[in-house]
């Protein structure tokens, strides 16, 4: 028998029976094809013992996660793309639902428009950690409301003909994928953040491999990544939290390593190939040189000049570059063969440790070369790092077993780079789902022709990028619309609103034209009447409501 909720009976056999039964249910859940590509570093019983005695709850977000999985699976099977953009508010999601099959919630947009501290700022993830989960709840509740409102309205049809007159229903329950930044702290913070997202309606979340303390927008300079395993631990924590909560949460692993210039630690051998070192043994540590200059009163520009000079004098290189340069300077006769011997064993995807690379270099050269990655460390204690597409491939391969989709943040909408990344990931994981940020930080008119813009999404889709999104389109379309209307209103008064807004709403059949109805006034009137025996003298949509003026404008009711 199951142990009662909040059980106080000290029965060992009953406890073991409950845990065995719960573990069996979890194993049955995990046997579904949904999890065929998912790796877990723990057992079903490990999850069972951490669930408590309360019966498992099916969170609405888990229903939406299963829906999202089916949406993405269909796109994968058909070679099509789920495309969406960052939504700001309930108005936007109610309109997006007519045409798009997913919704994105951007941390950047929340940082500038929806921080729970009400303090706007750039995308540094320094807002309270409940900011994006709160926006998810805001928009998810709006989705549920519009879904309820629509069903109640359609229930009034007395025949198939009347239902046909209403048109096809809108699927307002569009799965939401939200920005989890870099986790807002250590693994316990990642766990709590994931829990908030699940509780508040997110079908999926993405998390990047930047440090949480130095997190930057994916299109800012100075990005610092964490070691590969540290981000794997984050992804494992996300899935563990979802498993404990019996959630099918979709997990997107993002890497910012393509343009990363710093890394927090040298502990993971998979990162060693990309860590920058000094090759000049006579150079002083950079942090000491900079600190001395600061103490002597150097200005900002002087400090920048000092850093540039130090970097030139230090002979900064990756270790394999230093080895190749040393081979080419040597008197060895078969230089190209020796270089090939070294690079065949020390490459961006070989995961060779620095210790092993040094040993091989000594075997080839007959002596050790000077290379020190401690000397160039910056004042914050971070190591210099040179990422790139191959670095992103290495990391995406490491993240893939723990995530449903992988995503490389990039600085340009470069199709060839996207192709290189996709092929590099799929060489090891052929069925891996990919995501792509169609960022408004890119100068699209400068990057490609109009015809290329038109086909870009599907060309990426052909490479396996099944989920693509414009992170800040909600922000930019909002700004553009209000900019234009404010300008025209200042000049033309009510003509600007009547002709450029209201008339266009009529022409395009935008349901917000009847904003009282859109907001659910009729639905709420129905609730009031239901509560009061069928009548309400204070019904909002009764005689006298100004929205009656729109009855003859030809817009669908």
UniProtKB/Swiss-Prot annotation:
GO molecular function, one term: methylisocitrate lyase activity
Disruption phenotype: Impairs growth when acetate or ethanol are the sole carbon source. Leads to reduced chronological lifespan.
EC code: 4.1.3.1, 4.1.3.30
Binding locations of substrate: 106-108, 218-219, 254, 437-441, 471
Catalytic activity: D-threo-isocitrate = glyoxylate + succinate; (2S,3R)-3-hydroxybutane-1,2,3-tricarboxylate = pyruvate + succinate
Keywords: Cytoplasm, Extracellular matrix, Glyoxylate bypass, Lyase, Magnesium, Metal-binding, Phosphoprotein, Secreted, Tricarboxylic acid cycle, Vacuole
Record localization: Cytoplasm; Secreted, Extracellular space, Extracellular matrix; Vacuole
Activity relative to temperature: Thermostable for 60 minutes up to 50 degrees Celsius.
Additional record remark: Yeast isocitrate lyase is the only eukaryotic member of this family that is located in the cytoplasm, instead of being targeted to the peroxisome or the glyoxysome.
Protein name stated in the entry: Isocitrate lyase
Organism: Saccharomyces cerevisiae (strain ATCC 204508 / S288c)
Higher taxonomy: Eukaryota, Fungi, Dikarya, Ascomycota, Saccharomycotina
